[in-house]
């Protein structure tokens, strides 16, 4: 029997949120009742984030304000535990390339060991976003490249400000 309220989480660092992320979030919002954009806040992560978790959540909230069933929320535990806490039935992830699939396949196996009741759903990136990574956006912005077609306007402005400091 399917749950009455179909909730999913879409996890990521979103440092910063890109139009590729927003494509996946928007598509998930059309398929599910509630989409929680789970913004990772993990102090032991190898790569430090450029923006604090609160600002990354705000970027997502601003970019998805037109989607009534989407909200951003920070998390700092296992994604399957966060999914359980929020009542999510599935974890939704975007896949860009074969390398994403290999990584996500391994993560899916670990997640299923921890929480077999939580499904993993994968949405393929469209060609327009198949190359897009937050790290690439930051690198482009660092060297003065044009990022206006890669991130929401508020994010582009804030990223340029942050990198000029």
Per-range role (PLM):
Residues 1-165:
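Nucleotidyltransferase catalytic core that binds NTPs
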């Amino acid at each position: 029997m399917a749950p009455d309220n179909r909730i999913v989480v879409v996890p990521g660092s979103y440092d910063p949120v890109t139009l590729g992320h927003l494509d996946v979030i928007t598509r998930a919002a059309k398929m599910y009742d509630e989409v929680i954009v789970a913004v990772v806040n993990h102090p032991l992560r190898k790569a430090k984030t450029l923006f604090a978790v609160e600002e990354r959540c705000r970027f997502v909230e601003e970019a998805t304000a037109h989607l009534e069933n989407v909200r951003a929320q920070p998390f700092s535990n296992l994604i399957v535990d966060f999914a359980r806490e929020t009542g999510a039935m599935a974890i939704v992830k975007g896949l860009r390339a074969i390398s994403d699939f290999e990584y996500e396949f391994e993560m899916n196996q670990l997640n299923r060991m921890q929480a077999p009741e939580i499904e993993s759903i994968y949405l393929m990136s469209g060609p327009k976003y198949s190359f897009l990574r937050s790290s690439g956006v930051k690198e482009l912005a660092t060297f003065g490249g044009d990022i206006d077609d890669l991130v929401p306007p508020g994010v582009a402005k804030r990223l340029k400000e942050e990198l000029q400091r």
